[in-house]
Amino acid sequence: MAKHLFTSESVSEGHPDKIADQISDAVLDAILEQDPKARVACETYVKTGMVLVGGEITTSAWVDIEEITRQTVRDIGYVHSDMGFDANSCAVLSAIGKQSPDINQGVDRTDPLEQGAGDQGLMFGYATNETDVLMPAPVTYAHRLVQRQSEVRKSGALPWLRPDAKSQITFQYDDGKIVGIDAVVLSTQHAEDISQKELQEAVMEEIIKPVLPTEWINASTKYHINPTGRFVIGGPMGDCGLTGRKIIVDTYGGMARHGGGAFSGKDPSKVDRSAAYAARYVAKNIVAAGLADRCEIQVSYAIGVAEPTSIMVETFGTEKISTETLTLLVREFFDLRPHGLIQMLDLLHPIYRETAAYGHFGREHFPWEKTDKAAQLREAAGLK
């Protein structure tokens, strides 16, 4: 592969679509805390002055949707009408129904191992050894930029920052290896009374420089900080937000394929979410084992059927053993049936709200980021 550029973006927790994702996952967590076997498909819409929570939920739990919504928005930092959105005064509307019994009969089984997939679909997982967390560098550093924006906003270091922000970063590659950062874009909502010059200097010193490795920065690296010159109106006042609208930000920043299914608001019986996590787990363990430098896994399911309809391993010519052998190892060491992967990754816990901002992958404390199968895979592959 010759020289090329690759770009990924991220958005902060205060971006309207991410507010929606976090509310949906906060509702899911509250329900799973009381009822781990609940069926949850929770969708959220946010716009100036209002939040609408809808979907299909079947559970024995009772949760206060309004209070969960307000607390989530409060935690993000929208606590005053000056910001264009206020957790304390926004309207919260609920339109929740129950999961269709036609779906239930395909998912629930007397034998848990025969639990069927909650829907048909295809999911991808990916890993690469270009970063220490085995994630693509562009999306990893795009996330870290907006995470840093949140840190300095919440700590009071830059008190004029507001919750809505976006980042974008372009990396230079030569023969598949990173050689530098070509361009950095960071746009952040801000208070009315901060000058463009002061904002740009502070963002460079307090957000960009602490995050980006100096070895990838050079004299030709370009910076675009609030390039429109003004970003006072943001959050739900600037744009409406909807659950599931940031699926590339949530995954690999465009460097891997995507099956199209969103994650937030869905309990683990929905393979859109749980099988995508399992596919990441498989790919990461293959790369951690040194069996490939890059690995993409595809799995697919039929509604009501436990066994995956397909498993595909793609290693882009970086494999150390054949992809046929890798596929056999995946089938041997990973149970990718819905119940099997839920047990394998211990998914029936309220861990999802935190996934809903700054990426579902590459943060080591999530169970699908473990590399506990790497040594077994390496041994089974016959590599020393």
UniProtKB/Swiss-Prot annotation:
It comes from the Bacteria. It is found in: Cytoplasm. ATP binds at residues 15, 164-166, 230-231, 239, 245-246, 262, 266. Its cofactor is Mg(2+); K(+). Gene3D superfamilies: 3.30.300.10. Pathway: Amino-acid biosynthesis; S-adenosyl-L-methionine biosynthesis; S-adenosyl-L-methionine from L-methionine: step 1/1. Residues 99-109 are annotated as: Flexible loop. GO terms for biological process: one-carbon metabolic process; S-adenosylmethionine biosynthetic process. K(+) binds at residue 43. Catalyzes the formation of S-adenosylmethionine (AdoMet) from methionine and ATP. The overall synthetic reaction is composed of two sequential steps, AdoMet formation and the subsequent tripolyphosphate hydrolysis which occurs prior to release of AdoMet from the enzyme. PANTHER family: S-ADENOSYLMETHIONINE SYNTHETASE (PTHR11964). Belongs to the AdoMet synthase family. This is S-adenosylmethionine synthase. It comes from Erwinia tasmaniensis (strain DSM 17950 / CFBP 7177 / CIP 109463 / NCPPB 4357 / Et1/99).
